[in-house]
Amino acid sequence: MAAAVGRLLRASVARGVSAIPWGISATAALRPAACGRTSLTNLLCSGSSQAKLFSTSSSYHAPAVTQHAPYFKGTAVVNGEFKDLSLDDFKGKYLVLFFYPLDFTFVCPTEIVAFSDKANEFHDVNCEVVAVSVDSHFSHLAWINTPRKNGGLGHMNIALLSDLTKQISRDYGVLLEGSGLALRGLFIIDPNGVIKHLSVNDLPVGRSVEETLRLVKAFQYVETHGEVCPANWTPDSPTIKPNPAASKEYFQKVNQ
């Protein structure tokens, strides 16, 4: 009887392994391929256009700039503790919500650490930063507790939100349905919950924290002063009065 049960269990496990995404065995997922990469490395390094499993087919529509951000709610790791987090928690503040593919990967920790290290500069302009992936909050915490020299995150000054059901990634239009990973989507949401900026990178390329902070400051400047920000604007550079006559002041200044 025990032998029969054992055979059934082994057969069940074998069927489960054969259904693993990427179409490989569990051990093969961690074993270097002939080219010197793991299969997961291939996914994250080759980009979505290189793999058939990166299907973006979905019945959901990606949100657009000027539209209200889709509502979200989930469990996050905040200051080393589990905490419920939702879009409502950021009313009256700017929010940078950025998605990344997976914990314990390669480009992702560089982005998250960079945003965390700049958290105070975002706070100075009334802006919070939240990172999101399809991993569990337990995985987030384990990654935070891993030293940075070993590819971990270490102490975090930003929240890491779990999207284990993938619904948040799907609602924001960044989920790759075939692989179940999120593209590197970044959304700047204003204090009224309106999307002011969005960008989406393919998996192998990280984002600029400095550019994100510059954009937040630019949107805030426009709201406060009623003038518009030209290319490469920084807080100490001139802006443009948005009408034909007054705008000449700017163009004459920069084209002397």
Swiss-Prot record:
The keyword DNA-binding does not apply. SUPFAM superfamilies: Thioredoxin-like. GO terms for cellular component: cytosol; early endosome; mitochondrion. GO terms for molecular function: thioredoxin peroxidase activity. Its EC number is 1.11.1.24. The active site is at C108. It comes from the Eukaryota. Keywords: Acetylation, Antioxidant, Cytoplasm, Disulfide bond, Endosome, Lipoprotein, Mitochondrion, Oxidoreductase, Palmitate, Peroxidase, Phosphoprotein, Redox-active center, Transit peptide. It catalyses: a hydroperoxide + [thioredoxin]-dithiol = an alcohol + [thioredoxin]-disulfide + H2O. Thiol-specific peroxidase that catalyzes the reduction of hydrogen peroxide and organic hydroperoxides to water and alcohols, respectively. Plays a role in cell protection against oxidative stress by detoxifying peroxides. Acts synergistically with MAP3K13 to regulate the activation of NF-kappa-B in the cytosol. Required for the maintenance of physical strength. The active site is a conserved redox-active cysteine residue, the peroxidatic cysteine (C(P)), which makes the nucleophilic attack on the peroxide substrate. The peroxide oxidizes the C(P)-SH to cysteine sulfenic acid (C(P)-SOH), which then reacts with another cysteine residue, the resolving cysteine (C(R)), to form a disulfide bridge. The disulfide is subsequently reduced by an appropriate electron donor to complete the catalytic cycle. In this typical 2-Cys peroxiredoxin, C(R) is provided by the other dimeric subunit to form an intersubunit disulfide. This is Thioredoxin-dependent peroxide reductase, mitochondrial. It comes from Pongo abelii (Sumatran orangutan).
